[in-house]
Regions:
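Membrane-proximal helix-turn-helix segments that form the acceptor-binding/catalytic region
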Residues: 4-24
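Hydrophobic acceptor-binding patch used for acceptor engagement in glycosyltransferases
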Residues: 24, 138-140, 170-171, 191
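Carbohydrate-associated surface elements
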Residues: 30, 48-49
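Conserved catalytic-core segment of nucleotide-activated headgroup transferases in glycan assembly
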Residues: 51-54, 59-111, 122-127
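Nucleotide-sugar-dependent
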Residues: 76-79, 127-131, 139-162, 171-183
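Conserved active-site histidine-acidic residue motif and adjacent donor-binding/catalytic loop
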Residues: 102-106, 118-136, 144, 195
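Conserved acidic donor-binding segment of nucleotide-sugar-dependent glycosyltransferases
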Residues: 158, 176, 189-198, 206-212
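A charged, aromatic-enriched C-terminal amphipathic alpha-helix characteristic of glycosyltransferases
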Residues: 195-201, 212-243
């Protein structure tokens, strides 16, 4: 009962705030469209940017690809990472998914116990994230599938997507299509995306063995990064929103 009271109070407060003339800035189109439609706004999307420098195209080395994930492993992401590791093991028993995370709780880390194909590497500073991203052949973007996790990540879009795209590595996304990051990955056309566990191994094989797919993703990724994840572009959109609001005062 308290949840519903707080939810109704929150909705009333949000509607009161948005009843005033103004605009809004969002981190993704999905939440932009929802709020603009609900509150009659003309808000703009300012995507997260990245400091990682793009490296030249590199074909994925089939015999020993460096596969990495950086970030939070809660909200079902640990389960999805374990599933990716299992699928990699079926493709080649020597393949390893390196997972870098600040997580300390064994409740979330323990799922990797006994896996020959997932290595939990612990925490690394952002400078190392940039270095290891540049060294990786495949970077993973992942979300969970359970409703309780999807409800939290439905509109989220983390820095992992911007960093992965900016690096120049091949990017593989896996999770529910209802999650913001996965929906975005699927929509931009330069990230190999899987939203069905039954297709996971097939999707990974396609990325690892199809050089033409890797090239297409790399080249399309250049355009996506330039349009969506460059600081100059994001700054320009932000300034246009602020100037528009100030001009209406």
């Amino acid at each position: 009962p308290l949840y519903h009271i707080y939810k109704l109070s929150y909705r009333r407060l949000i509607r009161k705030v948005f009843s005033h003339k103004g605009s809004a800035i969002y981190i993704g189109n999905k939440i932009r469209d929802k709020y603009n439609e609900s509150f009659g706004l003309d808000g703009k999307t300012v995507y997260l940017t990245s400091e990682i420098k793009r490296h030249p195209f590199r074909e994925i080395p089939v015999r020993s690809p460096v596969i990495s994930y950086f970030g939070n492993i809660r909200l079902g992401r640990n389960e999805s990472l374990r599933e990716i590791g299992d699928a990699l093991g079926r493709i080649d028993s020597s393949y390893i998914l390196n997972v870098y995370s600040n997580e300390k709780d064994e409740h979330y880390i323990g799922i990797f116990d006994g896996s020959r194909n997932v290595k939990f590497c612990g925490t690394v500073p952002y400078s190392e994230v940039m270095k290891k991203s540049a060294e990786s052949d495949i970077l993973i973007v992942v979300e969970g599938f359970k409703k309780k996790d999807v409800d939290i990540t439905r509109y989220s879009l983390s820095t992992k997507v911007a960093d992965s795209l900016s690096s120049g590595a091949a990017v593989f996304a896996y999770g529910s299509a209802e999650c913001g990051a996965i929906e975005y990955a699927e929509s931009i056309g330069c990230i190999t995306t899987c939203t069905d566990k039954d297709m996971l191994e097939v999707s990974l094989r396609s990325l690892i063995y199809d050089t033409e797919l890797q090239i297409r993703n790399y080249e399309k990724g250049i355009t996506v990064v330039e349009n969506n994840h460059r600081l100059e572009n994001s700054t320009g959109i932000f300034e246009s929103v602020v100037n528009g609001v100030c001009g209406d005062l």
